[in-house]
Amino acid sequence: MNDTIVLIPVRLQATRFPNKPFAKIGDLPMLHYVYNAAFKSNFDVFLAICDEEIRDYCQNHQLPFVMTDPNHPSGSDRIGEALSKIEEHTHYDFIINVQGDMPFINQNYIQSLRSNLE
């Protein structure tokens, strides 16, 4: 079993950049780029979401997600709720937060962070 999870908080309600998770970068929306980079780290990855539109996208593209309360004041709160739901079934020793607007994060950074948590 993997002892590390990467959680990516994503929501549509950004005021400075509306609909940011669906901003196209090439052929894919930003949220998919972030997921792909995190997935390449070989850790378990989930999107922590609160919007039905994002849920529909995740379902249509087989991206693992956890629905959370839309009233969370921060991505960290969203991650906390998602983790509590996931840990009803699986326990993780290490939790890594990758922001949903980091499409160019390299999986090596995620792996390096995890190595330094030992």
Question: Which residue stretches match the model-derived regions?
Answer:
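Short phosphate-binding loop-to-helix
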Residues: 52-115
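Intrinsic-disorder/low-complexity regions
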Residues: 1-2, 92
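N-terminal start-of-chain detector that recognizes signal peptides
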Residues: 17-20, 114-118
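Short glycine/proline-enriched coil/turn segments at helix->beta-strand junctions
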Residues: 39-44, 60-64, 118
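N-terminal glycine-rich phosphate-binding loop and ensuing alpha1 helix
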Residues: 3-49
